[in-house]
Amino acid sequence: MEKLNLYQRIYKAQHLTQLQSLEKELKDLYGTLPREVNNIVLKRKYEILCTQPFIDEVKDAGGYVQIMLTQEFSAHIAGDQLFELVNRLFDKPQLKYIKNEIVIMIQTIGQWLPHTIELLNELKKMDEQSRHQ
């Protein structure tokens, strides 16, 4: 599969299930994904997760990524669980409460991208659980 076609297929994925299916296909084809391809897959996962309904906005804030959770999600999330999760994944994260929204500030150093993907996946699970109660 030529690189351009591969990258286009990754960026055309609109849902995590599509991306996971493509990732499985690539692993079956190539074995371990080359670092460059893996980084593109990670970036696309992050982009897709940033469009979840519990996220109000995500901003690049000069050395940090700022994730603003919606007022609705901020009102019903278990703050202690969020605090524990964020502090387990990141060194020196910042949590703020602005205009009834929880804001998470994460330094964009080291393994910030895979850890942020893990954070967003966990928040997605919390959101889904709260909607089924």
Predicted segments with their positions:
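Accessory helical-bundle/CTD segments and flexible terminal tails appended to RecA-like ATPase motors
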Residues: M1-Q133
